[in-house]
């Protein structure tokens, strides 16, 4: 079993947003992060809109069409969203075992998009 706080998950998310570095230390190679999170580098069947509607999939990350934007999702509604360009992360802890996981995921991603747009208007 693995027990972690939201702060622990936020540290992991920031490390990923910084291409494998945290506090000046390299934890994962930038090449690994790029391979895992770049939707164009995934094999057929895992590219955008092939793995699941409106996502791609790579190395346990759900990938969005925009490069550098991806998320991890737990079975009970846990969510870590990462936008590498803006260094924005979203961490949600949950123990919801409802069956509407797909709808919950879409709503959570839309929340993440709204947060990014609000703090980084273009």
PLM feature spans:
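Structured C-terminal helix/loop/strand segments within mature extracytoplasmic catalytic/sensor domains
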Residues: 69-122
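Stable alpha-helical elements in mature extracytoplasmic
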Residues: 5-9, 28-32, 108-111, 115
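Active-site Gly/Thr loop motif
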Residues: 34-89
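Non-transmembrane alpha-helical segments in soluble domains
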Residues: 10-17, 33-37, 59-62, 116
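A general structural signal marking secondary-structure boundaries and capping sites
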Residues: 19-20, 40, 119
């Amino acid at each position: 079993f693995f027990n972690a706080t939201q702060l622990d998950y936020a540290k992991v998310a920031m490390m990923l947003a910084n291409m494998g570095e945290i506090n000046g230390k390299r934890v994962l190679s930038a090449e690994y992060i790029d391979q895992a999170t770049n939707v164009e580098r995934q094999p057929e069947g895992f590219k955008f809109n092939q793995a699941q509607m409106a996502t791609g999939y790579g190395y346990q990350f759900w990938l969005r069409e925009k490069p550098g934007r991806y998320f991890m999702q737990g079975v009970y509604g846990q969510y870590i969203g990462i936008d590498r360009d803006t260094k924005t992360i979203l961490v949600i802890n949950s123990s919801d075992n409802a069956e509407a996981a797909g709808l919950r995921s879409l709503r959570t991603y839309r929340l993440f998009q709204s947060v990014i747009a609000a703090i980084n208007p273009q």
